Amino acid sequence: PTLKEINLDIYPGERVLIAGPSGCGKSTLAGCINGLNPFSNPGECTGELTVDGVNAPKSSIFELSAHVGTVLQDPDGQFIGLTVGEDIAFALENSCMPQEEMHEITRHAAELVGIQDHLDYAPHELSGGQKQRVSLAGVMVDQVKILLFDEPLANLDPATGKQTIELIDEIQEKTDTTVVIIEHRLEDVLWRDVDRIILMGEGQILADLHPDKLLATSLLEKNGIREPLYLTAMRYAGVEILPEKKPAHVDSVVWDEADRAKVVNWFRHRPAAQAFSQNEPLLEVKNLTFGYEKKQKTLQDVTLTIGKGEMVSIVGKNGAGKSTFSKLVCGFETPDSGEILFQGKD
């Protein structure tokens, strides 16, 4: 079975993070909560599941959607309307709500998530973070009591991910909803407080602890979840991580002078980064320019060289052109101008 003997209580107003490696059953559990499992994805379900007083296995996706609002990792898969406003109002239109009331509720939901100035925009004109806001507004028009986020940071850069977590925090404070976040980017989610972390592995719950208590253990590392980097640095420096040191957030960590001295000493004596020798050029990009539309260039005069045997990371915020650059190098798109040379050949 994908899930085995899950026993879990989530209380009104809580913010709970469900973490675990890929394939551990996080999204399957989310699908049980919102009704996708087993109503949309056939399967056998045993045991009991009550969602906001509703017997979930004997209910329906439609009935559960009035209690649970789900935001998926790929917001593009949730867009229905041709504009932001239409998309937010989709559920209201299905309930045949009068237009005047529908416009008012749509505007209110848009204001809650800070997207009110984009109601006439088409989905493809939005950034990744803005799309997440629209998806969130679309489920909030039903005034659900539970907001379920299934890997909401998967397609977002770190900065936009933090903004998304801040938005979730603000929405919960304003609406007092229960928030369940499915995610393995632990450090980004802990940018704002959570009440509990549910750690899953191989379809089972391995731990159900307050963040300070879980981060003081080695359970995350043992189960393939990267702990916050500041904790890794502290461990390398020989600092003992204890729950009373409040390790859940870098700003809340309690340090004493001995801990500070250990970290400073480790930092000063860590091995220097090795300088890479100049390898023979393998891939050369010269003055590469490309745009999906004539008036707007996604890449402009990009020039770089990657040597044989090098390992290179291309980073940047959403919309910076990383994927477009990869498509051009692979030949999936044709550049407007410039050269791409592989082993000296165009």
Q: What are the residue ranges of the model-derived segments?
A:
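Helix-to-loop junction immediately C-terminal to a conserved catalytic motif
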Residues: 34, 330
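Conserved ABC ATPase "signature" region
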Residues: 100-118
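ABC ATPase C-loop
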Residues: 139-140
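The feature captures the beta-strand-to-loop junction immediately N-terminal to the Walker
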Residues: 19-21, 315-317
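Conserved beta-strand-loop-alpha-helix hinge in the C-terminal portion
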Residues: 204-230
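Conserved ABC ATPase signature
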Residues: 122-126, 130
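Catalytic Walker B motif of ABC-type/P-loop ATPase nucleotide-binding domains
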Residues: 147-150
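Conserved ABC transporter NBD signature motif
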Residues: 42-54, 338-345
